[in-house]
Amino acid sequence: MAFRLPVVAAPEMPVGTQTSGSGRLPKWLKRPIPQKNSNHLTAELMEELRLETVCENAKCPNRMECYSQQTATFMILGNVCTRPCGFCAVHRGRPPQLPEADEPDRVAEAAARLGLKHVVITSVTRDDLPDGGAEHFYQCVVAVRERTGATTEVLTPDFVHCKPALGRVIEAAPDVFNHNMETVPRLYRRVRGPKSDYRWTLEMMRQVKRYNPDVKTKSGLMLGLGEQRGELLDALADLREYDVDFLTLGQYLQPGEKYLPVVRYVAPEEFDELAVLAKDMGFKKVASGPFVRSSYHARDMAETST
């Protein structure tokens, strides 16, 4: 049975004290206009090695900060996703090609040239592949470790059509396994699409620990999609019941008109409060703030784990 914290605010109210997400951004979500990506070594290297980053494809608000620090989250298996998630800016459709056999070597080359100490590897969802791309994840993790000695983190799709594929990813022994819950059960299929499964998301975390107890597990949620406070705390309790180690909480930002609207903007102080509650639940490390994303400062989270 999941551990439940007492709800400290009226559960009928969504998380956040601000007005609805329509209209102008609150001041804490405003940032200076970034310079062109071509001025940054990381972006140039990605182009040279024909690599995709989730930073660009998902329009991450932190990408210029990460590029300036010569860090990036590699996105393997192409840039076309087979899932119609309502929040994600990655192009959706039928992927035009099979995985590129030399991509693991190119990822390792980029990691080596950037001098990365912690490498995050994610992907689009590939329901068109028999193993969902698990073998490609395995090859990328092994290539990075052999070439650089860096710690590795995978941020995977759910492999819902090939659940045994999860074991192949864990055979590569990444230091951190990340799969994002994204939202609360009531909103799950609206946000993540009709093929998503909240319970399987949790079960993945349990399976990872069964395959390799030394692998740290991590998950994250976006706030501002209409979740209620009690629902959010229950979802966090579910993650802890399934022994998830690390947690990220960030503000959902609508990437374009055709995507799910922002219901509310959550104030920074509330993110701080939620971080305290999550740590009290037993998460070993929590990153909580308006601009937090699943791989934001991932190295810091991995290195400070015990």
Language-model-detected regions and their locations in the chain:
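Auxiliary Fe-S-binding modules of radical SAM enzymes
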Residues: 1-73, 89, 105, 109, ...
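A secondary-structure boundary/capping signal
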Residues: 56, 76-77, 122, 155, ...
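Nucleotide phosphate-binding site architecture
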Residues: 61, 82, 185
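Short pre-active-site segment immediately N-terminal to redox-active cysteine/selenocysteine motifs
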Residues: 77-84
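Short, surface-exposed acidic/glycine-rich loop or hinge patches that mediate macromolecular interfaces
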Residues: 79, 157-160, 226, 291
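Core AdoMet radical
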Residues: 89-106, 111-205, 218, 246-248
